Amino acid sequence: MNKDQTLSHTTGRVSFKELQQIIKMGLVQGNLIPAFAGAWLAIVMTNHSFLSSIPQILLMLVGSTLIMGGACALNNYYDQDIDRIMPSKQGRPTVNDRISDRNLLMLSFGMMLIGEACLFLLNIPSGVLGLIGIVGYVSYYSIWSKRHTTWNTVVGSFPGAVPPLIGWVAIDGSLSLAAVALFLVVFCWQPIHFYALAIKRSDEYALANIPMLPSVKGFKRTRVSMFIWLVLLLPLPFLLSNLGVTFVVIATLLNLGWLALGFTTFRKESNQTKWATQMFVYSLNYLVVFFALVVVVSLIKMI
């Protein structure tokens, strides 16, 4: 499809549902969970008042939402060529020409600029971490690694793990071991989560010539990599031992449960897609449960 044809079919206003697809609202919401947990933990561990910290939390969440949504919109702009090839992406407004390139870029950069303004209003570290997340996701992941190396998921995991750091520094202004621990949890979680998704869409990525690990190295190699990242998750709850024995035990059981799920089905010649789906669903629940546990346990300690 040439440019004239694309513009001629770009008609009407983008609906709210389509806007959510453009900025990948599901992905953004998932990242707001560790961002809030980072802020909450900073309040508890540095003895800040929750009520007096509410403005910072809200500004952090708004700023984080905007920079993540803007970066995702820019990713959708850059990925239009491969999205048109992949069957699962055919419903995207960028594929159906529901938004022009000009409006898409204006939306993307507008959101990122306003989001960065919000974060810099909080403090310089928040704004700098926001910039690191944007550059890492757009440049190093979307533009470079996604199309050139099977390490793309790991590269993308770094900017994807920045939200809890932003949450922490929004309150405290500097990083701590607890903040780094939250970063590492999200960093190690992402390859497992996205490899599971990539297994389910392996044929699509191969069709679009995207070097995702399952498409290039195969299913068995990808499962081994997922186990490595699962093992790396195991010691991380101990970095948050200040939250108490109860937290460490429950978080460790959460990790062991994920490992057991993967190992049990790994030993069987089960359907690859079914196995990947089980791991993917667990990953979604894991993220919510782990960070909810961080908030609840720290709340109990504060009371």
Curated annotation (Swiss-Prot):
Q: Which Pfam families match?
A: UbiA
On the tree of life, the source organism's domain of life is Bacteria
- GO molecular-function annotation terms? protoheme IX farnesyltransferase activity
Record keywords, A-Z: Cell membrane, Heme biosynthesis, Membrane, Transferase, Transmembrane, Transmembrane helix
The pathway where this protein functions is: Porphyrin-containing compound metabolism; heme O biosynthesis; heme O from protoheme: step 1/1
Query: Where in the cell?
Result: Cell membrane
Predominant subcellular localization, coarse grouping: membrane
The record lists the membrane-crossing segments as: 25-45, 54-74, 118-138, 166-186, 230-250, 280-300
First and last residue of the signal peptide: none
Residues in a coiled coil are: none
Q: Give the family, as the similarity comment puts it.
A: Belongs to the UbiA prenyltransferase family. Protoheme IX farnesyltransferase subfamily.
Q: What else is known?
A: Carbon 2 of the heme B porphyrin ring is defined according to the Fischer nomenclature.
What does the record give as the function of this protein?
Converts heme B (protoheme IX) to heme O by substitution of the vinyl group on carbon 2 of heme B porphyrin ring with a hydroxyethyl farnesyl side group.
Annotated PANTHER family = PROTOHEME IX FARNESYLTRANSFERASE, MITOCHONDRIAL
Q: What is this protein called?
A: Protoheme IX farnesyltransferase
Q: Which organism is it from?
A: Staphylococcus epidermidis (strain ATCC 12228 / FDA PCI 1200)
